[in-house]
């Protein structure tokens, strides 16, 4: 994966509701 794709990946995840929910769930569980 190129640096450009790596940089745009977070924004792409946010644009995808399904994946975004999974990421938010992982982040919330990680913080706890």
Swiss-Prot record:
Paired cysteines (S-S): none
Cross-link (2'-cysteinyl-6'-hydroxytryptophan sulfoxide (Trp-Cys)): 12-16
Entry keyword annotation includes Plastid: no
Residue numbers covered by the propeptide annotation in the UniProt entry: 1-10, 18-32
Ribosomal protein among keywords: no
GO function term, MF aspect, one: toxin activity
InterPro entries: Amanitin/phalloidin
Post-translational changes noted in the entry: Processed by the macrocyclase-peptidase enzyme POPB to yield a toxic cyclic heptapeptide. POPB first removes 10 residues from the N-terminus. Conformational trapping of the remaining peptide forces the enzyme to release this intermediate rather than proceed to macrocyclization. The enzyme rebinds the remaining peptide in a different conformation and catalyzes macrocyclization of the N-terminal 7 residues.
Known function: Major toxin that belongs to the bicyclic heptapeptides called phallotoxins. Although structurally related to amatoxins, phallotoxins have a different mode of action, which is the stabilization of F-actin. Phallotoxins are poisonous when administered parenterally, but not orally because of poor absorption.
Family: Belongs to the MSDIN fungal toxin family.
Superkingdom: Eukaryota
Protein's name according to its UniProt entry: Phallacidin proprotein
Residues joined by cross-link Cyclopeptide (Ala-Pro): 11-17
Alphabetical UniProt keywords: Thioether bond, Toxin
């Amino acid at each position: 994966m190129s640096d450009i794709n790596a940089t745009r990946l977070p924004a792409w995840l946010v644009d995808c509701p399904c994946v975004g929910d999974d990421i938010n769930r992982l982040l919330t569980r990680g913080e706890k």
